[in-house]
């Protein structure tokens, strides 16, 4: 079977109340073939905040996330081979979409941030400065197989605090978007007439005090 689901909670920022998202994708394979599931939050349509600033301003984006991933292949005779893969990605984009009426034309600020566990990796254009804190990577692809093997990412750890501080945003109308993706894929590689592989996979993504988890298994 394969299932996927997504939830956006308190999507509107009101009186300091944080927004949060949850994603889950799960697949289990018990016969010859392939199982796959994915959940995708497309920022252009489902997670966009629009706001205006009347003078040069600074912005701080902060959230709690817990990226947990596991991919595992454990073979039990007569099973001979299997593959399991889990993926997660997160990407934030801030852009000025228009200027205030009557203002002289100025270069449009643009910021893109894909937390990868390395600080100072945000792309910042036409702003004063950018400082990002990425305790762990939120952009990972993990896979194992065809033999017995296991690989994990941040499994069993507590959530971490992430932040992006931007200075020198000019007057104008802005949008802040999030694109998040979780996906899993399990495949059996049979010897003709001899192999039945049990495979499973699980992936989930959460922001704003929620857990982010990704797991793939094959046995």
Which residue ranges define each predicted feature?
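Helix-boundary and membrane-interface capping/anchor signal
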Residues: 1-188
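C-terminal cell-surface anchoring/sorting signal
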Residues: 195-219
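Generic low-complexity segments that are intrinsically disordered, proline-rich and/or Lys/Arg-biased
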Residues: 147, 191-193, 216
